[in-house]
Amino acid sequence: MRVLVRDLKAHVGQEVELLGFLHWRRDLGRIQFLLLRDRSGVVQVVTGGLKLPLPESALRVRGLVVENAKAPGGLEVQAKEVEVLSPALEPTPVEIPKEEWRANPDTLLEYRYVTLRGEKARAPLKVQAALVRGFRRYLDRQDFTEIFTPKVVRAGAEGGSGLFGVDYFEKRAYLAQSPQLYKQIMVGVFERVYEVAPVWRMEEHHTSRHLNEYLSLDVEMGFIADEEDLMRLEEALLAEMLEEALNTAGDEIRLLGATWPSFPQDIPRLTHAEAKRILKEELGYPVGQDLSEEAERLLGEYAKERWGSDWLFVTRYPRSVRPFYTYPEEDGTTRSFDLLFRGLEITSGGQRIHRYEELLESLKAKGMDPEAFHGYLEVFKYGMPPHGGFAIGAERLTQKLLGLPNVRYARAFPRDRHRLTP
């Protein structure tokens, strides 16, 4: 029966079978040292007289587990049998044991199918999986229902910009930029819903913080009083996500040298107007209606200095910079918010309009065609609760938590302005 590397300590003095990849090799003639890597770690294997295959070959090893203080982890396996299950046919383009994951991003991404085998390259994905697990678990406990919405749609949730068009038989369709309209519809069914799924944005940006395809963690909740209910929910949700990652992916977090954030019980809040005033009067950085990347970075520094917080809610954005479905106030603001983490927007959310006439008026005011949203609008003729929600960008959150230099390292196979493979 197979034993994982992490469990070898319980088998000292016993014969075991290991399955994994040849991580490294050293041939001293009569004696040969191998490092065997499986999903749980690396162990030294001592053998001799073999014609050693290339690194990354898949192996089966049968041998005796013994203690050796000089070996990685203090253990080694003295092999009695080594079988090559699948040989590597050529050297890897990047040496996995000498992994330098912060350098040469084009090379690392071009050969992602190999470089992901490196422990530092795969660590962000392990952390992200834990974050998503915490996301699901917390919402399940709060009586949310997971939903699965269409990804080929007739119109975008936020209008006609930023959409990837696709041919859908004799019609024109688009890749979904958000499940927004569907999750609102499903609030009328389950009251509380969430989805974990990819979304697409056709944006020309080619920066360390932008992806054209990313994993969106979406939440929508009915019968709320206002957007404050949503921010309170997100505070508790993020706390559980961070705890799950720390508890189950702590080795990966430490491997990357990440500074794990403290999580305040109450995230500081600034209205959009207050944020603009602080930027202009205290930080010397005037801004327009929306906040630029630099403005968000400065606000992140301000929150850290003033409150000791890595997190900051910016609330009450102007109606002009929010989607048509955002609940408006009479003063021209909206019941909306963004969550900044270490100076980067990772969440956008707010309360939605829940009355048919007001929603129709808002669509027209934005210059959008109500007919394109017919199925969505019809739902509001039959009663909808006051509701709202938010979406967390999984890759951005992972990037900032781990201090990754590029958001592409937080996705297994990233899609950006220039990358369509692998």
UniProtKB/Swiss-Prot annotation:
One GO cellular component term noted in the UniProt record for this chain: cytosol
EC number: 6.1.1.23
GO BP terms, alphabetized: aspartyl-tRNA aminoacylation
UniProt induction comment: Constitutively expressed in a constant ratio along the growth of the bacterium.
Record-listed ATP binding positions: 201-203, 209-211, 345, 393-396
InterPro entries: Aa-tRNA-synt_II, aa-tRNA-synth_II, aa-tRNA-synth_II/BPL/LPL, Asp-tRNA_synthase_2, Asp/Asn-tRNA-synth_IIb, NA-bd_OB-fold, NA-bd_OB_tRNA
Assembly mode: Homodimer. Makes part of a ribonucleoprotein particle (RNP) called transamidosome that allows channelling of the aa-tRNA from non-discriminating aspartyl-tRNA synthetase active site to the GatCAB amidotransferase site. The transamidosome complex is formed by two GatCABs, one dimeric ND-AspRSs and two tRNAs(Asn) molecules.
Name used for this protein in its record: Aspartate--tRNA(Asp/Asn) ligase
Taxonomic source organism: Thermus thermophilus (strain ATCC 27634 / DSM 579 / HB8)
